[in-house]
């Protein structure tokens, strides 16, 4: 029975999410809250931590793979490799630290550079620590305006209260799924066009 279960899990669709943002904005806290329903305030940064979880997305069982990358400059050189493997990105900043919001533009540029061959990259801008409203440095209008300029969704979250934590991960998975479906459609369209052409060519040769 266990073998069957393992097999079915192995055949589930896998969506790869990368957490991106400056150090201390709460990327790990958001990830751990989503994974384990726990709020972890102090978390030692590493190069990257990977998590995998089975979830139900719009009635379909899927797996989400979350790579939580460190925001520190020391790790900038290895970030490119992580970005290449990602299918969607949560670009996180803290609403209490304007500098972390400013840094999102640079992180986005890095993602676009690494994924230059792709048309539309699934990405959400996330303003974390919404529970600390009294310490807000980034106005909602400013963050929303930047997200609109980039053509992406802006959501405010709190890893502490769990506000919108599920929303950002599930919304991003929906974007990843839509992109995959669109790519498969294009691929199948090209394939059928190719086979029609080769059939035509064969007919001509005969």
UniProtKB/Swiss-Prot annotation:
It catalyses: GTP + H2O = GDP + phosphate + H(+). Its EC number is 3.6.5.2. InterPro entries: P-loop_NTPase, Small_GTP-bd, Small_GTPase, Small_GTPase_Ras-type. Alternates between an inactive form bound to GDP and an active form bound to GTP. Activated by a guanine nucleotide-exchange factor (GEF) and inactivated by a GTPase-activating protein (GAP). Belongs to the small GTPase superfamily. Ras family. A lipid is attached at residue 203 (S-geranylgeranyl cysteine). Residues 204-206 form a propeptide. Keywords: Apoptosis, Cell cycle, Cell division, Cell membrane, GTP-binding, Hydrolase, Lipoprotein, Membrane, Methylation, Nucleotide-binding, Prenylation. It comes from Rattus norvegicus. The modification Cysteine methyl ester is found at residue 203. GTP binds at residues 21-29, 68-72, 128-131, 158-160. Pfam families: Ras. A motif (Effector region) lies at residues 43-51. Prenylation is essential for membrane localization. It is an enzyme of class 3 (hydrolase). This is Ras-related protein Ral-B. The keyword Cell membrane applies. GO terms for biological process: apoptotic process; cell division; cellular response to exogenous dsRNA; cellular response to starvation; positive regulation of autophagosome assembly; positive regulation of epidermal growth factor receptor signaling pathway; Ras protein signal transduction; receptor internalization. Its main location: membrane. Residues 181-206 are annotated as: Disordered.
